[in-house]
Amino acid sequence: MQETQDQLEQMKTMISKPAGRKDYSLMQEESVPSTPSGSTVGSLITAVGQNEHNKVRNDEEATSSASPDGTPSTVDEGDVEESNSDISGVNEQNFENELETSLAEGKSWHSAQDLNKSHTEEPIDDPNEDKMSEINLEPSNKGIEKNATVTEKSATILAKELSATTDVKKKCLRAAKPNELPAEEYCNEDLKGAISGLERRTSKPDLETNEIQDAKSLESGIGSSGNVNEVPKQNAKHPMDSCQNLEQSAGTTSAEKEAIRALESQSSGTSQASLAKHKSETNTSIQSSTQETAQAPTVYEELGSEAERSKSHAQAYKNQTDEKEMSGEIIKENPENAIDDASSPSKEYDTPSFAGKPEEGSENLKAPAKDGEPVDSEKKKKNGGTPIEGRPLQSLEGDAPQVPQRPNKRPPPKKPSSKIAAFQAMLKQQQLMDASKTKDKQIDSGNSLLSGKRANITNNLNGIFGLPGMAPGMTPGMVPPQRPPARQQTGSDGGSQSSENQTSSQSAAPSGPQRRARGPKGRKLPAHIANVEKVETSIKTNEIQVLKTWSLKFQKISPTCSEKDSEPLKDIPESGVVSPSNPKSMSELNGVPVESDVICERETDILQNSKNEMNDLEDTNEDNVKEPRQFSIPTHFDLGESDANQEESS
């Protein structure tokens, strides 16, 4: 007993801290409320925090009890020491109970809540907390018995929950095959959330094995000594270490609770019914455990059975992890059951350490090669270097057709202006018309030197080159335009003069409408150019007057001779002999005029004509009338008539 007390005093001195210093870690532990299940973990933490807080408060009261003048207060030092000794005795007893319960307690995810809250958060008052703290103040043997029952109940509850989650998982895997179950029984749970919860529960085997070892050592010590107080404190750990372990376990349990809440919200159909049933069972079991803690058993051997149960739970965890890994592979092989990670809600807790490890057998699983993917070199060697079935590699290289290069595209031609395009269209149309005309006409080979194809060359050049005397737009076969024939003059002089005056008075009409001069792009011309007066040029005309200058008149002239000529001829004797008394020439007798007679007639005619002309001139001067002169010129001499007249006169 004395040795144990010495060890407890040493541990107390290690735990104790200087007066006036507050331990915020213990204050944080004190602020953690107890779980509704009434487990001893929350009560242990609150008891330790209350003891430390009372100790610090007493120290502060002792220091502050001095008067403001610096004199000590009237409180005796003995009273303070007695109060401290009483508190230390209670603290030692509570510490022993806490140490033993922390070693014997199994892993229970209903034991604590999230410890990551802020320091300023106020603790929630719970009536169960006071009850558990009172229970912990009892002797150590009763506390061990009560804690053993609590851990046993928590272990059974954990086993039920694990079995329920595995059942849900199996149902979801079966529901992935639509041929086995109807569509009404399909599971819409978040499979990844359920599996991650199992992984987190089984992700700390080291902590569980350490607790089992501590329980074994405690069991062996109790069996050897027969009293809990005589158990050696070799395996005693610092309370802060135990608190850290509890924080870690509480973090995992809070993560598991969040996963279960996500499953409850996302599940539907049979999964919702199973989860509701499971939740009701857990609540009833927790309430029964809280009621049984008030009635502590009196058997000490339950501690050994608790260790054996923890071993069985550890073995069950390992089996479930194996089943979980197999189920994870099956789910990943079925792409229909895969759930997108982006759609799953973000979790505040950390992911397990082995979440990113590759699965076993994933290296052997390879997707089948597609048609467009290149074939590996090993496969090519096995197939004899034939990437295409039925043809060797060398034949493909030799027979591969070479793709000719595409010629460069010609640049698009520039668009001509409207005037140029109109001129080209007119020229083309004119050439077509000329070609059609030349085809109709057949060229004679005898008359022309050119024949056959050579003639077509000249015909095609007709519309391009102009010949002398051709107007623009004419072809060689066309006749040039002529002036209209002049109007015939009327018989009377007055009518001709009136028509000439009308033509001279008429002015030539303008060729076309005169357009207003415009500047570039329809702009107005400047003022000094637009205001210039236009000069109209008169068309010059040539007036022609026709006058009679001379004329020819043909008429008969009466014969005039001298008296000698006018004498009648004598009768010619029948014999025809000329007598000497009437000497006449033979010409007279024969009716032929003599030269002297002809000269006489000519002279008389000339004289008579000259007289007539003089008379005509005098008449014109008197009448003042412009008349052409008339000349009578004998064109021939009628000898026969003159002879006949002479005969008649004779």
Swiss-Prot record:
Annotated function: Involved in mitochondrial migration along actin filaments.
Bias (Low complexity) ranges: 488-507
The name this protein goes by in its record: Altered inheritance of mitochondria protein 21
Extent of Polar residues compositional bias: 1-10, 31-51, 63-74, 85-96, 242-254, 264-274, 282-296, 444-462, 578-588
Keyword Kinase in record: no
Coiled coil: none
Annotated signal peptide: none
Record's keyword terms, sorted: Cytoplasm, Cytoskeleton
Composition-biased stretches (Basic residues): 407-417, 515-526
Main localization, broad class: cytoplasm
InterPro entries with a match to the protein in the record: Aim21 (IPR021582)
Protein family membership: Belongs to the AIM21 family.
Higher taxonomy: Eukaryota, Fungi, Dikarya, Ascomycota, Saccharomycotina
Record organism: Lachancea thermotolerans (strain ATCC 56472 / CBS 6340 / NRRL Y-8284)
Pfam family, one: Aim21
Cellular compartment(s): Cytoplasm, Cytoskeleton, Actin patch
Region (Disordered): 1-148, 197-529, 559-650
Basic and acidic residues compositional bias, start-end: 198-217, 320-335, 368-379, 562-573
GO CC annotations, alphabetized: actin cortical patch
Compositionally biased intervals (Acidic residues): 640-650
